[in-house]
From Swiss-Prot:
GO terms for biological process: box C/D snoRNP assembly; protein stabilization; rRNA processing. It comes from the Eukaryota. Pfam families: PIH1, PIH1_CS. InterPro entries: PIH1/Kintoun_subfamily, PIH1_N, PIH1D1/2/3_CS-like. It comes from Homo sapiens (Human). Belongs to the PIH1 family. The gene is PIH1D2. The lineage of its organism: Eukaryota, Metazoa, Chordata, Craniata, Vertebrata. This is PIH1 domain-containing protein 2. One of its GO terms (molecular function) is small GTPase binding. GO terms for cellular component: cytoplasm; protein folding chaperone complex; R2TP complex; ribonucleoprotein complex.
Length: 315
C-alpha cells in the first residue's frame, strides 16, 4: 500500500511539473488545456434534457399504455462513425396510476448530436425510436406494439423525476454545479499535496446527494441490428369537397405490393396523424392536413390490387 501511495504521489508530482512547464513555455496552450478540462467537467455534470415523447403500448407481460421520453444528454457519447454502435441509456420503468387510467413511463437518453441529426430526417428519427423500443424490450423482457405516435408534449411526467431516474442522484438539493464551484482549485490541490504528501484532497458529496441507485449503464445498439428497415409505400392523399367546395373527408390510397391480406396491416389513427405498419415491410406515418373524426374512419383493403383505402371524415 505504501509503495502504491508513493507511486501515485510521484505521478501527481510529475503531472504538476508538466503543467508548470506548460504554463511557462506555452501560456496559450496551458489556457486551452484548462478550459478544455473545465468544459469536459461541465458536460459530465450536465443533466439530461427532454427532446420528445412518444406513446405506444406494452403488450406483454401485461397490456398497458407506455410513454417513452427521448432525452438528450451530453454524458452519452456520440457514435464514432455511422458504422459504429449508437450509445444510449435506458432508465427504469415507472408505473403511474391516475384517476382515469394507468400507464408506464420509461426515459431513454441519446447524445444531443444524434438527436439533432434526426430532427428533420424522419427515417433517422424512426430508427432511433425503433432502437429505443428494441432496447426496452430486451432489457425488461417486454413485448411492445410497434405502432406509436409522437405526443404534443415533450415529456411525460416532471423533468425532476426524469433526471432522478436517468442520473441516479437527487436533484432537489443544492445544484451539483454549485458543488463544483466549491471544489479545491488546482493550486490548492498542488500546495496541499506537496506540503502533506500523505494527504490527498477529496471532493465529497453530502449524504443527500448520494443515491443508493446505481447509475444506469450505457447500452450500445448496433445499427446493423436494425436492418429490417421498413419501406415507405407509394400513396395518394386527397381532400374530398362537396358541391359548395366545403371539405368533407380525407381519402388515402396506399399501394402495398406483395401484401394479400388485411390482417397483415396495423393501422393507428389519431385526430391529426396516421400510422400504417405492414408485416415489417412497409411503414407510413403522415401528419394529416385537417382534423378527422377517428370514430367514423373506415378502411378497405382491395386484395386484387394490394391497395388499402382509408376514408377519414373531417370533424
Amino acid at each position: 500500500m505504501e509503495t502504491s501511495s508513493k507511486g501515485l504521489l510521484t505521478q501527481v508530482t510529475q503531472f504538476w511539473n508538466l503543467l508548470d512547464d506548460l504554463a511557462q513555455s506555452d501560456p496559450e496552450g496551458y489556457e486551452k488545456f484548462i478550459q478544455q478540462q473545465l468544459k469536459e467537467g461541465k458536460q459530465l455534470c450536465a443533466a439530461p434534457e427532454p427532446q420528445l415523447c412518444l406513446q405506444t403500448r406494452i403488450l406483454k407481460p401485461k397490456e398497458k399504455i407506455l410513454f417513452i421520453n427521448l432525452c438528450q444528454w451530453t454524458r452519452i457519447p456520440a457514435p464514432q462513425s455511422t458504422t459504429h454502435p449508437v450509445p444510449l441509456t435506458v432508465g427504469k420503468p415507472e408505473d403511474t396510476t391516475e384517476i382515469s387510467d394507468a400507464y408506464t413511463v420509461i426515459d431513454v437518453a441519446y447524445n444531443p448530436d444524434v438527436l439533432h441529426a434526426a430532427e428533420k430526417d424522419q427515417v433517422k428519427k424512426n430508427q432511433l425510436i425503433q432502437m429505443a423500443m428494441k432496447c426496452i424490450e430486451e432489457k425488461f423482457q417486454f413485448t411492445l406494439s410497434h405502432s406509436y405516435h409522437i405526443t404534443k408534449f415533450r415529456i411525460k411526467g416532471s423533468i425532476q423525476r426524469m433526471k432522478q431516474n436517468l442520473m441516479g442522484i437527487q436533484t432537489d438539493s443544492i445544484d451539483l454545479r454549485e458543488k463544483m464551484r466549491r471544489e479545491l482549485t488546482l493550486g490548492q490541490i498542488r500546495s496541499s499535496t506537496m506540503s502533506n504528501p500523505d494527504h490527498f484532497p477529496q471532493l465529497l458529496l453530502p449524504k443527500d446527494q448520494v443515491s443508493g441507485k446505481a447509475v444506469c449503464l450505457i447500452e450500445e445498439i448496433s445499427s446493423t441490428e436494425i436492418q429490417v428497415e421498413m419501406k415507405m409505400p407509394a400513396y395518394e392523399l386527397k381532400i374530398v369537397h362537396d358541391h359548395s367546395e366545403k371539405p368533407l373527408k380525407i381519402e388515402l390510397k396506399v399501394e402495398l405490393p406483395g401484401i394479400n391480406s388485411v390482417s397483415l396491416c396495423d393501422l393507428s389513427v389519431s385526430e391529426d396523424d396516421l400510422l400504417i405498419e405492414v408485416s415489417e415491410k412497409y411503414r407510413l406515418h403522415l401528419n394529416l392536413p385537417k382534423l378527422i373524426d377517428t370514430e367514423m374512419t373506415t378502411a378497405k383493403f382491395i386484395k386484387e390490387k394490394s391497395t388499402l383505402i382509408i376514408t377519414m371524415p373531417l370533424v
